[in-house]
């Protein structure tokens, strides 16, 4: 018998043990992957009229089912799938938050009464703007029902992103959540050129940031000999290791994650994409993507690089200050309501980084609570924007909102309340969210950072109040926009978002207790 045959015989005699996978602990993600595949089959084989009903129901049922699975896992705390996925308090809290925001976003996407031709999304992203096909597409009643499985795929990537305990798995999750969004951004029914430009910019810059992230993964492996977050943490500070690889890994991973949260100076995609994307997709990105990206950022910095927090804290300080200043100052110059809200999102990313700069349990709790408060408010705000329309689509220019408080006082009053919440006025969720992160920063000896945040909050309040003054203290335009009163789903979304903004402002303790429990349990590794 030859040597090769002997080796093969010995290998065949050995029992290969497959990895143990707790499928029940992965059920939220598995449910969504299954629903997304079912959505693809529905779109391929169901008739058009049936698709319009089945797809939103299927997506909504999937999000509800995944949320129930998250609730049932509340007591779980384990690393599974060969160390690739971590189920712990922060993971489950953030996954539940993402699913709630995704369900609200589905209501906006499913709305067909806003536009005379149908929903906010069209049936094809590749039609040349200004062409005969583009004109026909704008007035066609066809609905892009593929948007629903794309959304479900993206949300499943978000759930995996916040649960990843392995940098390569985190990269895969990043691509799963990002690729559907690139396409969804280009599906706006109106202003096709702006929408396609947004999709292209988001794709190119997103691919660029993903390359940075992947390069950071390579350096982490070169330093620690592993891409598992726990093993990277064990290698930090080890004698004889090449710290150059460690710092390069931290910097490159940070660039990739700062891009996803829209932090300066990696925020340049945010205003263009928020403005050009269909407003339901903008709301979905503004809330869901920010939660997922911050969840991954917190896990990477707290788990893998927690042992060198004194090295990365100054970087967080600098990025937080730059992000708050850029977001607040540039929002002052905007004349488009969606671009203004985009720069507001940049500023809020800076406020979230203030809590992270505390690098303590209070910072983790404050950041998670802030993400919930911000998400409800911003989804409701973009839903209001979609209701104010002209004959050419949404009235996004600020001058068109002049006198809206006199023609539609209820809607204008709701929008004013949401803007005040974003500004952080007491008795709103914005105030309690900022209080939570600022308190954590002070406890973590970052008081100067809180002072800068308060100054930027005052600057930000100016452009919020400017819109309120324009709506209530200006004469309405003769040919001004109208408020569409038929969209039941959109009004329901506005109502839910505004109600949660109020409840989390006057009675935040139940959610704070939930965030405290999740943060105290900590990250597993």
From Swiss-Prot:
One Gene Ontology term of the molecular function aspect: quinone binding
GO biological process, one term: ATP synthesis coupled electron transport
Keywords: Cell membrane, Membrane, NAD, Quinone, Translocase, Transmembrane, Transmembrane helix, Transport
One cellular-component annotation, GO: plasma membrane
EC number(s) from the headed UniProt entry: 7.1.1.-
Transmembrane among keywords: yes
Main location: membrane
Residue ranges of the TM segments: 26-46, 53-73, 90-110, 143-163, 167-187, 202-222, 246-266, 278-298, 314-334, 341-361, 368-388, 411-431, 449-469, 487-507
Main EC class the enzyme belongs to: translocase
Catalysed reactions, semicolon-separated: a quinone + NADH + 5 H(+)(in) = a quinol + NAD(+) + 4 H(+)(out)
Membrane-protein topology: Multi-pass membrane protein
Compartment(s): Cell membrane
Quaternary structure annotation from Swiss-Prot or TrEMBL: NDH-1 is composed of 14 different subunits. Subunits NuoA, H, J, K, L, M, N constitute the membrane sector of the complex.
Family named by the database record: Belongs to the complex I subunit 2 family.
HAMAP family given in the database record: NDH1_NuoN_1 (MF_00445)
NCBIfam families, per database record: NDH_I_N, PRK05777.1-4
Function statement: NDH-1 shuttles electrons from NADH, via FMN and iron-sulfur (Fe-S) centers, to quinones in the respiratory chain. The immediate electron acceptor for the enzyme in this species is believed to be a menaquinone. Couples the redox reaction to proton translocation (for every two electrons transferred, four hydrogen ions are translocated across the cytoplasmic membrane), and thus conserves the redox energy in a proton gradient.
Protein name per the record: NADH-quinone oxidoreductase subunit N
Organism whose genome encodes this protein: Parafrankia sp. (strain EAN1pec)
Gene: nuoN
């Amino acid at each position: 018998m030859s040597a090769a045959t002997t080796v093969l015989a010995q290998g065949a005699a050995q029992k290969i043990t497959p990895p143990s996978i707790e499928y029940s602990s992965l059920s939220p993600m598995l449910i969504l992957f299954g629903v997304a595949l079912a959505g693809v089959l529905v779109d391929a084989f169901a008739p058009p009229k049936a698709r319009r009903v089945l797809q939103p129901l299927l997506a909504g049922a999937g999000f509800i089912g995944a949320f129930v699975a998250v609730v049932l896992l509340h007591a779980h705390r384990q690393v599974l799938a060969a160390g690739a996925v971590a189920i712990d308090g922060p993971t489950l809290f953030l996954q539940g938050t993402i699913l709630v925001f995704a369900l609200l976003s589905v209501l906006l996407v499913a709305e067909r009464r806003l536009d005379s031709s149908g929903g906010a999304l069209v049936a094809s992203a590749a039609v040349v703007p200004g062409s005969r096909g583009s004109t026909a597409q704008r007035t066609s009643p066809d609905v892009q029902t593929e948007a629903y499985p794309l959304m479900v795929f993206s949300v499943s990537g978000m759930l995996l992103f916040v649960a990843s305990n392995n940098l390569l798995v985190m990269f895969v999750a990043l691509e799963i959540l990002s690729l559907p969004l690139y396409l969804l951004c280009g599906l706006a029914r109106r202003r096709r050129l702006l929408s396609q430009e947004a999709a292209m910019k988001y794709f190119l810059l997103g691919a660029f940031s993903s390359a940075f992230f992947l390069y950071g993964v390579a350096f982490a492996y070169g330093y620690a000999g592993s891409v598992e977050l726990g093993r990277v943490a064990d290698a930090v500070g080890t004698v004889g290791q090449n710290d150059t690889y460690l710092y390069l890994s931290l910097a490159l991973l940070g660039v990739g994650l700062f891009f996803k949260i829209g932090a300066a100076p990696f925020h340049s995609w945010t205003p263009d994409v928020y403005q050009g994307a269909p407003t339901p997709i903008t709301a979905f990105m503004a809330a869901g993507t920010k939660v997922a990206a911050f969840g991954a950022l917190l896990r990477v910095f707290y788990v893998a690089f927690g042992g060198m927090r004194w090295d990365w804290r100054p970087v967080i300080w600098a990025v937080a200050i730059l992000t708050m200043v850029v977001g607040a100052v540039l929002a002052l110059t905007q004349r488009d309501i969606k671009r203004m809200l985009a720069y507001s999102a940049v500023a809020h990313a800076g406020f979230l980084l203030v809590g992270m700069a505390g690098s303590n349990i209070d910072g983790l709790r404050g950041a998670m609570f802030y993400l919930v408060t911000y998400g409800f408010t911003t989804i409701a705000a973009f839903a209001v924007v979609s209701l104010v329309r002209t004959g050419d689509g949404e009235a996004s220019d600020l001058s068109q909102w002049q006198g809206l408080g006199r023609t539609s006082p209820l809607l204008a009053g709701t929008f004013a309340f949401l803007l005040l919440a974003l500004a952080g006025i007491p008795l709103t969720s914005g105030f309690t969210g900022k209080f939570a992160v600022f308190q954590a920063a002070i406890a973590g000896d970052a008081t100067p950072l809180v002072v800068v945040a308060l100054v930027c909050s005052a600057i930000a309040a100016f452009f919020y109040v400017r819109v309120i003054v324009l709506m209530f203290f200006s004469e309405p335009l003769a040919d001004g926009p109208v408020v569409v009163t038929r969209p039941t789903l959109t009004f329901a979304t506005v109502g839910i978002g505004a109600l949660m903004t109020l409840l989390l402002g006057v009675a935040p303790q139940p959610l704070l207790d939930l965030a405290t429990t999740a943060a105290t349990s900590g990250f597993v590794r």
